[in-house]
């Protein structure tokens, strides 16, 4: 029985990657397209003046992008994790591994995650677990990678679509609070592509969580992945569940939103998307599916070159926004239009204030 469970988990990991890459071949319209920065025609700064450094859970990093959790737990994904670790090392960006539950249940899979630290010995690495994982097991996940931080992913929609997924969730908040109090490294609570509302963020802030990853709809769709894995595909009605990254970011502009650090991920496609997310308060921006897609189609070297180009392009966008650093970018005026503006108005977000901030 244990062997069958292990094989099922390994197959699931491989299917996640294959289906995730397929999704990224043709991207749907993004809610971030409804966000427009108000720039300048007479910049105050030169490109060389721009400072892209940011802080993630107390660690200073030189560029506001990280490789978000996606994979690990099978022979095939070990190779992918090794290549992602090389990209993270050469581009000097943090990296999160995929859920480590497989390795916690089957020690023969530990190396599929540990390879990340072997290839990137000095980089910022985030371990990744579910709130189903008991504290002592979670500490093993941190040790496995000598991790700098711990991601706890919350994914009820994915679990419900997954035939072998969890069906009990009421203990999650207590478990997360336990990690916040006892983890030897900082904790980031992240969604997996269904987005966090400000109410969810407040619930987490109330138990001591200091950083969340809003992880909205628009990137890899795990409801679709799990539904595609089912023979009956019985959950096709749930494929559009959740809020987009743009909606999650706008929701955090409400006057009652908790004042904690947040990261943004889900449907980030280019440097302009990064700038928009940072301008709406994110400290850094995560990508998973698009980086794996680039890796699969173009290889490690081309993906690193793309990220280096993005750094230069990002500096140019900061110049156009009249912002020397991320702190200044967060005061840049923004116009919210289209469906995102309608959604924001219904959520009582002061869009006029956003459009006229200084």
Swiss-Prot record:
Mg(2+) binds at residue 159. GO terms for biological process: isoprenoid biosynthetic process. CDD domains: IDI-2_FMN (cd02811). It is an enzyme of class 5 (isomerase). The lineage of its organism: Bacteria, Bacillati, Bacillota, Bacilli, Bacillales. Keywords: Cytoplasm, Flavoprotein, FMN, Isomerase, Isoprene biosynthesis, Magnesium, Metal-binding, NADP. Substrate binds at residues 12-13, 158. Belongs to the IPP isomerase type 2 family. This is Isopentenyl-diphosphate delta-isomerase. It is found in: Cytoplasm. Its EC number is 5.3.3.2. It comes from the Bacteria. NCBIfam families: IPP_isom_2. Its main location: cytoplasm. FMN binds at residues 69-71, 99, 128, 190, 220, 267-269, 288-289. Its cofactor is FMN; NADPH; Mg(2+). One of its GO terms (molecular function) is magnesium ion binding. Gene3D superfamilies: Aldolase class I. Involved in the biosynthesis of isoprenoids. Catalyzes the 1,3-allylic rearrangement of the homoallylic substrate isopentenyl (IPP) to its allylic isomer, dimethylallyl diphosphate (DMAPP). One of its GO terms (cellular component) is cytoplasm. Homooctamer. Dimer of tetramers. It catalyses: isopentenyl diphosphate = dimethylallyl diphosphate.
């Amino acid at each position: 029985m244990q062997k069958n469970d292990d094989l099922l988990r390994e197959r699931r990991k491989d299917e996640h990657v294959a289906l995730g890459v397929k999704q990224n071949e043709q991207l749907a319209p993004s809610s971030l397209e409804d966000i427009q920065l108000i720039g300048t025609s007479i910049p105050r700064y030169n490109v060389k003046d721009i400072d892209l450094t940011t802080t993630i859970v107390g660690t200073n990093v030189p560029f506001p992008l990280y490789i978000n959790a996606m994979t690990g737990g099978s022979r095939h994904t070990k190779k992918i994790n090794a290549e992602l670790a090389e990209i993270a090392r050469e581009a000097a960006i943090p990296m999160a591994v995929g859920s480590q539950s497989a390795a916690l249940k089957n020690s023969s899979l530990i190396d599929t995650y540990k390879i990340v630290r072997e290839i990137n010995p000095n980089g910022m690495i985030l371990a990744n677990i579910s709130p189903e994982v008991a504290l002592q097991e979670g500490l093993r996940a941190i040790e496995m990678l000598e991790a700098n931080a711990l991601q706890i992913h919350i994914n009820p929609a994915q679990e419900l679509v997954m035939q072998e997924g969890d069906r009990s969730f009421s203990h999650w908040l207590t478990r997360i609070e336990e990690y916040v109090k006892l983890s030897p490294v900082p904790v980031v609570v992240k969604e997996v592509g269904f987005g966090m509302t400000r109410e969810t963020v407040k619930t987490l802030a109330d138990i001591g969580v200091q950083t969340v990853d809003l992880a909205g709809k628009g990137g890899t769709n795990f409801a679709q992945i799990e539904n595609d894995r089912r023979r009956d595909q019985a959950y096709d009605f749930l494929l559009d569940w959740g809020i987009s990254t743009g909606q999650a970011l706008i929701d955090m502009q409400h006057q009652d939103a908790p004042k904690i650090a947040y990261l943004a991920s889900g449907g980030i496609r280019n440097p302009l998307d990064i700038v928009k997310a940072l301008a709406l308060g994110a400290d850094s921006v995560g990508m998973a599916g698009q980086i794996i897609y680039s890796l699969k189609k173009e290889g490690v070297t081309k993906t690193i070159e793309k990220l280096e180009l993005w750094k230069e392009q990002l500096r140019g966008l900061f110049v156009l926004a009249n912002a020397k650093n991320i702190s200044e970018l967060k005061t840049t005026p923004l116009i919210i239009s289209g469906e995102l503006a309608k959604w924001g108005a219904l959520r009582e977000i002061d869009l006029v204030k956003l459009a006229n901030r200084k």
